Curated annotation (Swiss-Prot):
Keyword flag Protease: yes
Domain USP: 199-524
Residue span(s) of domain MATH: 54-179
Start-end of Pro residues biased regions: 1-10
Enzyme Commission number: 3.4.19.12
Organism: Arabidopsis thaliana (Mouse-ear cress)
Protein name: Ubiquitin C-terminal hydrolase 12
Keywords (A to Z) from UniProt: Hydrolase, Protease, Thiol protease, Ubl conjugation pathway
Pfam families given in the database record: MATH_2, UCH, USP7_C2, USP7_ICP0_bdg
Species classification: Eukaryota, Viridiplantae, Streptophyta, Embryophyta, Tracheophyta
Role according to the record: Recognizes and hydrolyzes the peptide bond at the C-terminal Gly of ubiquitin. Involved in the processing of poly-ubiquitin precursors as well as that of ubiquitinated proteins. Positive regulator of root meristem development that, together with UBP13, prevents the ubiquitination and turnover of RGFR1 induced by the RGF1 hormone peptide, thus influencing PLT1 and PLT2 expression.
Substrates-to-products reaction catalysed: Thiol-dependent hydrolysis of ester, thioester, amide, peptide and isopeptide bonds formed by the C-terminal Gly of ubiquitin (a 76-residue protein attached to proteins as an intracellular targeting signal)
């Protein structure tokens, strides 16, 4: 993901990343640029005579699907005295999503340096169910450079244009903007440390969720002290050690003057850049991080700290009403998940948590020795921890919409929380009543935005004083109690009205999308222990030394950077550098300037004084030095261009640098010419216009080696033949040795190296200062085979050579072999070389797959036979080039395979338990019937006349029975499992009063949610009218071969939309199920609840969860 220049105000992240509209082609919007204003109606609700600083604007856009302009603007509306409008791209701003921005309508005519800050939300209204309205919220400091801001990927166009979704009704779209204009913030000059005594954490891309959690943990001093006391050594690397990385982070938060980076910590988690750009679940991160620390604290002086701070216990109980039977189970917790929906406040959530559930009627409890009994089921707390972490369930699964939704309801939480209230109603009989469970609020973690992303920050009272602080990434501010508590309750807020009598409409209310999702309370009786003093003596000596050294180095760099404008960097290349580098590090041009000696000289220093520095460094007297300025030519080569004049050498170095390169950050690059005679320097001869400085490279075709030979000053009127003797002498050839000369002209984008006529003058050959001439002995002995017989072919090879790492596709992490190839190799050349390496007779049986540089995985689609022209096309991925290719060895030639479709089919035998996977390969135009016929030739059937069917299975559920006429080219077996099975006789003979139902295995997740998880193999079952569950159970037990002992533990439920309704043996199952042709019937099934004893196997990523549901993992 690429993010444009970040805004000056703290930037919330969203999954699509907030960006300004970078529509450079169309240029900035003009003040009056309104597209078809007469076709779009706009209304402003509650706009009194004087505009309030907060306002809601509604824009009705008719004929939406017929909009043929790329950009579309709303009417102008005024908020806080400023003019605004909404800008949309109906077909997306170069993406397959609707793009939508808030725009300053008169930006082009505003005075220089204008700026304004607004918090705003943009929405596309769902006109069928308003609760499904898509709304996104952000804030931005608008200025001339960024006069619009919003969301390039607001919502998928496929959803927007689908009339059944409710966003486009009668070809009309409703867009809403809620804008609050705030005081302009001077972001850049704000000093968090100076203003508050605390510093923030830098955001790596989408890590504000982690920053808010880390600040909360850091401000629990007992926790911080324990982290400091975890044993680490000076040999540990912070990027590989979580304890050391966390110690380092906490130390910097305590002693730095500016915000702190978290990259070391995320690297110690084993995260790559991609992980840092993923918005993870904060609650999950908290649990995983604490589990890791708990594990790493074992066997150390701080073992048990995590449990001491955060661990509490509750008792799950089931108590029979009519018989003397009670079952209890003690469980520990590190945090509690509290319901928000339907609860007024924290106390209401605790009431709900301990609410007694009655098990009666169809849901009786099976008590050992007593059979089915009416019972009470509930939870009571044995003890609470000193630090109580409450996770508020702001995100819930909406079964009707099949998606996650955010609960923005008002939910209150007190400054002081008394969990002993009403005579200890939350406590179990075993609880220690001498412990006073009175808690004080320490932290409020806030989420601003919607379910698909947003921004996280925290309000914290570090010492439990009356002063609150807001920790929002890099920025820390002082806040009052109202901001930390009441404003984070969520719910709705009324827009202010300056003239309540202006009309009789009720005040407009808008939903607040910023609200608390996690609360941290500290027990009053443990306050002094937890809010303890933490100072330098708690920090290991090696850590203090390391971090102070880091700080000093950082300060040196900062000082160096701050003084950079006073200095000029001069890089001096010499003959010795050319000799060292040509033929080893470089082949084209003359030198890599990053590897030559550089001097940092004050800009005002006279050049003559700099020459004295050079004399000291290289031992070359000042009078023997001559310096040449380098220049970039039009063909992108970089050569010495001209010597400095005596007048220039009287100037300061800064002036010379500026004359040679106007860029402020540019360096002054020079070539030092020193003349040698008997190894002693002599003054360089005076240079006239007739003199040309040339550089020479020697090529040895037998060894394929290029080296630097030296340089000569030649007359432009002379000819190459005049200097062949000197060149031979230079490299130790016989004086009359025949040599060929070539001019190295350029190497980008392709090599140009041309033969030089020895009898034509340098002037006529257009040879000038800084040109490079390569020479070699001609190949006389034709028996000697040379891959690159002449300079041009060798330079062509060097420019295009590419080392490629080949990996077997089934082992995508392991390099198997490396081949040196040419970027110009054709598809056929590449597969021939690979086949030769593998000892394969037929190269057409190889299939190659390119590498995805971002995911570090093979691309999903292989390279088609002769589908690319050259190796260079195989290695490129967007703007990056890889050096990895994956290969497969096929059993038939690739061109033949490309005309076929291969399906992976799992065959389930009617009587055998073993499932066998078959690869069925058929022409693409084949049908499912052809697949079944092919499969019949490969499998053993229970009887010769058995009929087969093909099913689509996903997440242990059956989604489709394929009709035999369906063509296979559109069937996807990458994400779905294709299952073939015999059709049972009873299904073939199904009667008019029978029903075919789905039967799935399931288990409930442990914990408060108790979400249903399917597992195992789903199947069909015929049920008959009037048949009871008991009769069906007998058939299921027989079908699945389950022992009586195990089967007695199974429960049976009618499942609809993911919710179980438990059945009794006497229930008639038939009545529960709708006909198969009724909408929604596919979501109804008979659920078999029992323990999952199937062997676990690693699913592919796409079988496990979607990319955006990536779990939090700390690998180290």
């Amino acid at each position: 993901m690429t993010m444009m220049t970040p805004p000056p105000v703290d930037q919330p992240e969203d999954e699509e990343m907030l960006v300004p509209n970078s529509d450079l082609v169309d240029g900035p919007a003009q003040p009056m640029e309104v597209t078809q204003p007469e076709t779009a109606a706009s209304t402003v609700e509650n706009q009194p005579a004087e505009d309030p600083p907060t306002l809601k604007f509604t824009w009705t856009i008719p004929n939406f699907s017929r909009q043929n302009t790329r950009k579309h603007y709303s009417d102008v509306f005024v908020v806080g005295g400023y003019k605004w409008r909404i800008l949309i791209f109906p077909k997306g701003n170069n993406v397959d999503h609707l793009s939508m921005y808030l725009d300053v309508s008169d930006a082009a005519s505003l005075p220089y340096g204008w700026s304004r800050y607004a918090q705003f939300s943009l929405a596309v209204v769902n006109q069928i169910h308003t609760r499904y309205t898509v709304r996104k919220e952000t804030q931005h400091q608008f200025n001339a450079r960024e006069s619009d801001w919003g969301f390039t990927s607001f919502m998928p166009l496929s959803e927007l244009y689908d009339p059944s979704r409710g966003y486009l009704v009668n070809d009309t779209v409703l867009v809403e903007a809620e804008v609050a204009v705030r005081k302009v913030l001077d972001y850049w000059s704000y000093d968090s440390k100076k203003e508050t005594g605390f510093v923030g954490l830098k955001n790596q891309g989408a890590t504000c969720y982690m920053n808010s959690l880390l600040q909360t943990l850091y401000h629990i001093p007992y926790f911080r002290k324990a982290v400091y006391h975890m044993p680490t050594t000076e040999n540990d690397a912070p990027t590989a050690s979580i304890p050391l990385a966390l110690q380092s982070l906490f130390y910097k938060l305590q002693y730095n003057d500016t915000s702190v980076a978290t990259k070391e910590l995320t690297k110690s988690f084993g995260w790559d850049t991609y992980d840092s750009f993923m918005q993870h679940d904060v609650q999950e991160l908290n649990r995983v991080l604490c589990e890791k620390l708990e594990d790493k604290m074992k066997g150390t002086v701080v073992e048990g700290t995590i449990q001491q701070l955060f661990e509490g216990h509750h008792m799950n109980y089931i108590e029979c009403i009519n018989v003397d039977f009670k079952s209890t189970r003690k469980e520990s917790f590190y945090d509690l998940q509290l319901d928000v929906k339907g609860c007024k406040d924290v106390y209401a959530s605790f009431d709900k948590y301990v609410e007694v559930e009655r098990l009666e009627g169809d849901n009786k409890y099976h008590a050992e020795g007593h059979g089915l009994q009416d019972a009470k089921k509930g939870v009571l707390f044995i003890d609470f921890p000193p630090v109580l972490q409450l996770q508020l369930k702001r995100f819930e699964y909406d079964f009707m919409r099949d998606t996650m939704v955010k609960i923005n309801d008002r939910y209150e939480f007190p400054l002081e929380l008394d969990l002993d209230r009403e005579d200890g109603k939350y406590l179990s009989p075993d609880a220690d009543r001498s412990v006073r469970n009175l808690y004080t609020l320490h932290s409020v973690l806030v989420h601003s935005g919607g379910v698909h992303g947003g921004h996280y920050y925290a309000f914290i009272r570090p010492t439990l004083s009356d002063q609150w602080y807001k920790f929002d990434d890099e920025r820390v501010t002082k806040e009052d109690l109202k901001r930390a508590l009441e404003e984070q309750y969520g719910g709705e807020e009324e827009l202010p009205q300056t003239n309540p009598g202006f009309n009789n409409n009720p005040p407009f209310k808008f939903t607040k999308y910023s609200n608390a999702y996690m609360l941290v309370y500290i027990r009053e009786s443990d306050k002094d222990k937890i809010i303890c003093n933490v100072d330098e003596k708690d920090i290991a000596e090696h850590l203090r030394v390391r971090l102070k050294k880091e700080q000093e180095e950082k300060e040196d760099k900062r000082r160096y950077k701050a003084q950079a404008h006073l200095y000029t960097i001069i890089k001096v290349a010499r003959d010795e550098d050319l000799k060292e580098q040509i033929g080893k590090d470089i082949y084209f041009d003359l030198v890599d300037h990053d590897k030559v000696r550089s001097f940092r000289i004050q800009k005002q220093t006279p050049f003559q004084q700099f020459k004295e520095e050079v004399a000291k460094e290289f031992g070359v007297p000042v009078q023997l030095q001559r310096f040449w300025i380098w220049a970039k030519r039009q063909n992108h080569t970089y050569r010495p261009n001209r010597p400095l004049t005596p007048q220039e050498e009287l100037q300061p170095v800064g002036q010379i640098r500026e004359a040679s390169n106007k860029a402020n950050t540019a360096e002054l690059k020079l070539f030092l010419e020193v003349e040698h005679l008997d190894l002693r320097p002599i003054p360089p001869p005076e240079k006239s216009k007739e003199d040309i400085l040339l550089f020479f490279k020697l090529y040895d075709p037998e060894k394929a080696v290029l080296s630097y030979a030296g340089r000569l000053m030649v007359k432009s009127s002379s000819k190459p033949m005049d200097i062949t003797g000197k060149l031979n002498e230079m490299v130790g050839f016989a004086p009359d040795e025949e040599i060929e000369l070539f001019e190295e002209i350029k190497f980008e984008p392709c090599v140009m190296c041309e033969h030089l006529d020895k009898k034509t003058s340098f002037r006529l050959c257009q040879i000038e200062d800084g040109d490079i001439i390569c020479f070699q002995k001609p190949l006389v002995n034709k028996e000697i085979e040379c891959l690159y017989p002449a300079v041009p072919s060798f330079l062509e090879y060097v420019q295009n050579r590419q080392l490629v790492r080949f990996r077997a596709l089934e082992k995508p992490k392991e390099d198997e072999f490396v081949l040196e190839l040419s970027k110009q190799h054709t598809y056929d050349d590449v597969v021939e070389k690979v086949a030769e390496k593998l000892g394969l007779d037929d190269p057409s049986k190889l299939r190659l797959t390119s590498h995805n540089c971002y995911s570090q995985q093979p691309k999903p689609q292989p390279i088609k036979y002769r589908g690319v022209d050259h190796l260079s096309d195989m290695l490129v991925h967007y703007n990056q080039t890889s050096d990895i290719l994956y290969y497969e060895v096929l059993d038939i030639p690739l061109p033949e395979l490309q005309g076929l479709k291969t399906l992976k089919v799992a065959f389930h035998h009617a009587t055998k338990e073993e499932v066998v996977i078959h690869n069925i390969r058929l022409p693409k135009q084949s049908t499912v019937g052809d697949v079944i016929n092919e499969l019949k030739t490969k499998v053993e059937l229970s009887h010769p006349d058995a009929e087969l069917r093909l099913l689509e299975v996903f997440y242990h559920k059956i989604y489709k029975i394929f009709p035999s006429t369906e063509r296979i080219e559109n069937i996807n077996d990458q994400y779905w499992t294709l299952r073939a099975e015999e059709i049972p006789e009873e299904e073939k003979n199904i009667g008019p009063n029978d029903r075919l139902i789905l039967v799935y295995h399931f288990a409930k997740e442990t914990g408060q949610n108790q979400q249903v998880q399917n597992f195992g193999e789903p199947f069909f079952l015929v049920i008959h009218e009037g048949e009871t569950l008991e009769e069906i159970k007998n058939r299921i037990q027989k079908k699945l071969h389950v022992s009586d002992e195990d089967f007695a533990k199974w429960k049976f439920a009618f499942m609809s939309m993911g919710r179980p309704e438990y059945l009794q043996d006497t229930d008639v199952v038939y009545n529960r199920f709708q006909r198969r042709d009724v909408y929604g019937a596919f979501e109804q099934y008979l659920g078999l609840e029992h323990a999952d004893t199937t062997p676990k196997r690693a699913y592919a990523a796409n079988q496990n969860r979607h990319a955006y549901e990536k779990p939090v993992k700390i690998y180290n």
